[in-house]
């Protein structure tokens, strides 16, 4: 495997974005590396999916109609770990600059990913986040 290639086989990613094109392109990027992607359109759907499916990684847009990514990460972090409260998460957003990055990290996301994102950059961040997911590090390292 070349250094820029990531193996995401078996990594369950929950993607939330209200834009159909973004959902389709990001899901396709991650599936290229073997991730299993569940894509939803709203923060409410994402919160329910976190509790129901316990994804390994959460990728969320920040600006969505009704409730956005900040609302979502606040609700996720308020959950007990066994219900998804410790799910590793990244904000995938068009909001750029150090002030937005700082706000994202303070809110409870581990990464701030600026749109547009390259295939390999996205895969690397998801790979890093997956290593921090409960039970995933061993599964990834033994491949």
Give residue spans per PLM region.
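Active-site residues of response regulator receiver
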Residues: 61, 93
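Active-site beta3 strand of CheY-like receiver
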Residues: 53-59
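Two-component/phosphorelay signaling modules centered on CheY-like receiver
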Residues: 20-38, 107
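The feature encodes the CheY-like receiver
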Residues: 65, 97
């Amino acid at each position: 495997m070349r250094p820029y290639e990531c193996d995401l086989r078996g990594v369950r990613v929950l993607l939330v974005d209200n834009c159909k094109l973004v959902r389709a392109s990001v899901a396709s990027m991650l599936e290229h590396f073997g991730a299993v992607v569940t894509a939803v359109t709203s923060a409410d759907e994402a919160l329910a999916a976190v509790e129901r499916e316990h994804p390994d990684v959460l990728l969320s847009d920040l600006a969505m109609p009704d409730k956005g990514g900040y609302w979502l990460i606040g609700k996720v972090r308020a959950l007990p770990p066994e219900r998804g409260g410790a799910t590793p998460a990244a904000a995938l957003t068009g909001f750029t600059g150090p002030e937005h990055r700082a706000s994202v990290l303070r809110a409870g996301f581990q990464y701030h990913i600026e749109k547009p994102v390259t295939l390999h950059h996205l895969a690397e961040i998801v790979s890093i986040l997956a290593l921090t997911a409960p039970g995933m590090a061993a599964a990834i390292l033994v491949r």
